[in-house]
Design a protein with these regions (language model features):
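Cysteine/selenocysteine-centered motifs that mediate thiol-based redox chemistry or coordinate metal-sulfur cofactors
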Residues: 134-164
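Charge-rich, low-complexity N-terminal segments
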Residues: 1-48
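Hydrophobic residues embedded in beta-strands of well-ordered beta-sheets
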Residues: 25-26, 71, 106
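A short, polar/proline- and glycine-enriched secondary-structure boundary/capping micro-motif
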Residues: 37-42, 86-87, 117-121
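Phosphate/ribose-recognition catalytic cores of enzymes acting on nucleotide-derived substrates
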Residues: 42-83, 89-96
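Short acidic-glycine loop/turn motifs at beta-strand connectors
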Residues: 21-23, 67-68, 101-103
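A hydrophobic, small-residue-rich beta->alpha segment in the mid-to-C-terminal subdomain
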Residues: 94-139
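A long amphipathic alpha-helix within ATP-dependent nucleotide-binding catalytic cores
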Residues: 76-79, 83, 90, 130-146
């Protein structure tokens, strides 16, 4: 189970399958039985998302694949307070997302939400600085992080070939 907590106090829970959970990293699988859209991408029915949640990193990664196994996109979420445990992954969402298309083009989403959270006093100056540092890191190193995720999926026997 993925538990996504928000700075305003709410939370969302997502059902998933744990492929591997260690004190360092949890890898989860989210099947998508129905079609959906996000980040300007279409995810056909039968698509799947692999989630990578690191205990000591301020981001998580979703690797999104179509029903044919082809890469649709990568999405990184800036997060804090990641907790990995048996049957659950929990974290605090810090609003900013970085999307990367299969060509490697990267862009950020929800910067306006970050500004609004800061102006409402829900985001401390320290966390704002953390978001900015993590954004720079993700824009500079998304290819390396995606390759690391691909290696992990191959180790788990979930993929053959390139993860993107």
């Amino acid at each position: 189970m993925e538990i996504k907590r928000f700075l305003h106090g709410g939370e969302e829970t997502y059902r998933c399958l744990a492929l591997d959970v260690s004190p360092r990293l949890a890898v989860l699988l989210f099947p998508h039985p129905g079609e959906r859209r996000a980040g300007g991408f279409l995810f056909p029915a039968g698509s799947r998302t692999y989630g990578f949640f690191w205990a000591r990193r301020h981001y998580l990664l979703y690797v999104l694949h179509g029903p044919d196994g082809g890469l649709i996109a990568h999405r990184f979420d800036v997060v804090d307070e990641v907790r990995l445990g048996p049957g659950r992954v929990e974290y605090l969402d810090l609003a900013l997302d970085v999307w990367v298309d299969p060509s490697g083009r990267a862009w950020t989403e929800d910067e306006d939400e970050v500004v609004e959270l800061f102006s409402q006093g829900l985001l401390s100056p320290q966390r704002l600085s953390l978001i900015e540092r993590t954004q720079r890191l993700l824009l500079a190193r998304h290819r390396r992080i995606a390759a690391e995720a691909g290696d992990e999926l191959r180790r788990l026997g979930q993929m053959h070939g390139n993860v993107g």
